[in-house]
């Protein structure tokens, strides 16, 4: 089980990423634009660096919905491998059954 503080930190990161998404995309467009002058690019880089660190989407971590576990996450179900196996063994995941060959 993940600490409550880690789960709360992820919630804050998601909110910050949503808040600064448009600003971040705008600055990145200026930086990657061929038509921008060097000075405009440099100013855009400085502004991008001044944004909060947690506003970057790459800082987010996908976590299990039940436990908050960050490793072994199965995106299709939103669960960690452990909780997915438990749910599958109880028959709670339609169409999923234990493999045997």
UniProtKB/Swiss-Prot annotation:
<dbReference type="InterPro" id="IPR023036">
    <property type="entry name" value="Ribosomal_uS14_bac/plastid"/>
</dbReference>
<feature type="compositionally biased region" description="Basic residues">
    <location>
        <begin position="59"/>
        <end position="68"/>
    </location>
</feature>
<dbReference type="GO" id="GO:0019843">
    <property type="term" value="F:rRNA binding"/>
</dbReference>
<keyword id="KW-0694">RNA-binding</keyword>
<dbReference type="GO" id="GO:0006412">
    <property type="term" value="P:translation"/>
</dbReference>
<dbReference type="GO" id="GO:0003735">
    <property type="term" value="F:structural constituent of ribosome"/>
</dbReference>
<keyword id="KW-0689">Ribosomal protein</keyword>
<comment type="subunit">
    <text>Part of the 30S ribosomal subunit. Contacts proteins S3 and S10.</text>
</comment>
<dbReference type="InterPro" id="IPR001209">
    <property type="entry name" value="Ribosomal_uS14"/>
</dbReference>
<feature type="region of interest" description="Disordered">
    <location>
        <begin position="50"/>
        <end position="70"/>
    </location>
</feature>
<dbReference type="Pfam" id="PF00253">
    <property type="entry name" value="Ribosomal_S14"/>
</dbReference>
<dbReference type="InterPro" id="IPR018271">
    <property type="entry name" value="Ribosomal_uS14_CS"/>
</dbReference>
<keyword id="KW-0687">Ribonucleoprotein</keyword>
<comment type="similarity">
    <text>Belongs to the universal ribosomal protein uS14 family.</text>
</comment>
<protein>
    <recommendedName>
        <fullName>Small ribosomal subunit protein uS14</fullName>
    </recommendedName>
</protein>
<comment type="function">
    <text>Binds 16S rRNA, required for the assembly of 30S particles and may also be responsible for determining the conformation of the 16S rRNA at the A site.</text>
</comment>
<dbReference type="GO" id="GO:0005737">
    <property type="term" value="C:cytoplasm"/>
</dbReference>
<keyword id="KW-0699">rRNA-binding</keyword>
<dbReference type="GO" id="GO:0015935">
    <property type="term" value="C:small ribosomal subunit"/>
</dbReference>
């Amino acid at each position: 089980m993940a600490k409550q503080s880690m789960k709360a930190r992820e919630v804050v990161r998601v909110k910050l990423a949503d808040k600064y998404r448009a600003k971040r995309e705008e600055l990145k467009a200026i930086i990657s634009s061929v038509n921008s002058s060097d000075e405009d690019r440099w100013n855009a880089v400085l502004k991008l660096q001044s944004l909060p660190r947690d506003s970057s989407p790459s800082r987010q971590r996908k976590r299990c919905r039940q436990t908050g576990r960050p490793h072994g996450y199965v995106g299709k179900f939103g669960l960690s491998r452990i909780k997915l196996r438990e749910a599958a063994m109880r028959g709670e995941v339609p169409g999923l059954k234990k493999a045997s060959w």
